[in-house]
Amino acid sequence: GFEGVALKKAWAIAKTESNGRPMAYNGNRNTGDSSYGIFQINMLGNLGIDRKEKFELKSNILLFDPVINAEITYYMTQGGNDWSSWPSYNSGKMKEWLGKFPS
């Protein structure tokens, strides 16, 4: 799983995306979202089809399981090394949480 700096970034992304809530859902299709869980994995359109197949998900509801959500996020970020698919990383919004990581 996530370790060191990657763990801090993962925590900050989760806090920014969902405030750490495993049952968070953003279904705003106007903004291109159908995002699930703690890391807000987007399943809209072809993204969802590809991700369901790649991660053997029978239903998007499984993404509300924080362990499954984190495992998929770990894979998608190449072990926490590439967060470029997360707008909160690209915009820098997650930085406000980096300094608040629990010690």
Which residue ranges define each predicted feature?
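Catalytic and binding regions of secreted/periplasmic enzymes and modules that target cell-wall glycans
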Residues: K9-A12, M23-S103
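Export/targeting segments at the very N-terminus of extracytoplasmic proteins
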Residues: G1-G20
